[in-house]
């Protein structure tokens, strides 16, 4: 038997919104320690990894390890039926072919119950190696989303340059070029969620397809800040915290010069 009850059901709705445009189907792996998910997008360019710890749920029960194959589009449709203040419960029997989703209003005057068919998925878990990064930038989630949206009007790729002075995002295209630079600001008069921090051991400059960064930025409602971890020639990591219960990480391989020349 698997059962997970989340008082702040809106967090689960936000997680679903953050995943559905990148991953069409995925295995939700449930153990006694929580729920995890790892999947690549259909073009195998980006990878998403989700962790929700058991202690973040009001009730969490998982009698035996369970891999639930879920159609993300179907789940998104059902999740839209839940109110933002609803309590959400996920429930499945061992070896079940259905996932039960229960939405309870916070006042207790409405109880909705849905069943969703599970899929048989053959998912290969990729080992994500531990990595020390040359540069880690933390900035407001909304600011990151705005930068990605703005520069996507200019070009299809964004160059992220990280130095001790700050981080710069730049793009160029047929209409011209644009760049946005953020300097570190961590003063006591600045709210924590509005701060920009840069931890750097060596300068980094990498190029990425901006359409993926725009998809990652859909996780912005989950957390007031986002962390970008970079090193030359390794995938970028974009990490959002999920309340006090876990995180969602996106991995995106940088574009190499040959690819950039073909795109231009």
UniProtKB/Swiss-Prot annotation:
Keyword DNA repair: no
Biological process according to GO: leading strand elongation; mismatch repair; regulation of DNA replication; translesion synthesis
Swiss-Prot/TrEMBL keywords: DNA replication, DNA-binding, Nucleus
Record-linked InterPro entries: DNA_clamp_sf (IPR046938), Pr_cel_nuc_antig (IPR000730), Pr_cel_nuc_antig_C (IPR022649), Pr_cel_nuc_antig_CS (IPR022659), Pr_cel_nuc_antig_N (IPR022648)
Alphabetical list of SUPFAM superfamilies matching this protein: DNA clamp (SSF55979)
Pfam families: PCNA_C (PF02747), PCNA_N (PF00705)
Highest taxon above the source species: Eukaryota
GO terms under cellular component: PCNA complex
Record localization: Nucleus
DNA-binding region: 61-80
GO molecular function, one term: DNA binding
HAMAP family, alphabetized: DNApol_clamp_arch
Family, similarity comment: Belongs to the PCNA family.
Record's subunit section: Homotrimer. Forms a complex with activator 1 heteropentamer in the presence of ATP.
Function of the protein: This protein is an auxiliary protein of DNA polymerase delta and is involved in the control of eukaryotic DNA replication by increasing the polymerase's processibility during elongation of the leading strand.
Protein name: Proliferating cell nuclear antigen
């Amino acid at each position: 038997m698997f059962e997970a009850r989340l008082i702040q059901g809106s967090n689960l709705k936000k997680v679903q919104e953050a995943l559905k445009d990148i991953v069409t189907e995925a295995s939700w792996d449930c153990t006694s320690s929580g729920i995890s998910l790892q999947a690549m997008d259909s073009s195998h360019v980006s990878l998403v990894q989700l962790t929700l710890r058991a202690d973040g749920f009001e009730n969490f029960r998982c009698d035996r390890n369970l891999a639930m194959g879920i159609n993300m589009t179907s789940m998104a449709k059902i999740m839209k039926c839940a109110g933002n203040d609803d309590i959400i419960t996920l429930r499945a029997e061992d070896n079940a072919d259905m996932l039960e989703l229960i939405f309870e209003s916070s006042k207790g005057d409405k109880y909705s119950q849905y069943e969703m068919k599970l899929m048989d998925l053959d998912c290969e878990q990729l080992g994500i190696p531990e990595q020390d990064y040359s540069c880690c930038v933390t900035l407001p989630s909304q600011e990151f989303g705005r930068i990605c949206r703005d520069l996507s009007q200019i070009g299809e790729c964004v160059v992220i340059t990280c130095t001790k002075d700050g981080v710069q995002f730049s793009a160029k295209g047929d209409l011209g070029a644009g760049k946005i630079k953020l300097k570190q600001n961590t003063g006591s008069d600045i709210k924590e969620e509005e701060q920009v921090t840069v931890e750097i051991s060596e300068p980094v400059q990498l190029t990425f397809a901006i359409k993926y960064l725009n998809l990652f930025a859909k996780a912005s409602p989950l957390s007031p800040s986002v962390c970008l971890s970079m090193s030359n020639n390794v995938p970028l990591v974009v990490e959002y915290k999920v309340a006090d219960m876990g995180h969602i990480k996106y991995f995106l391989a940088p574009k190499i010069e040959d690819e950039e020349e073909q795109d231009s």
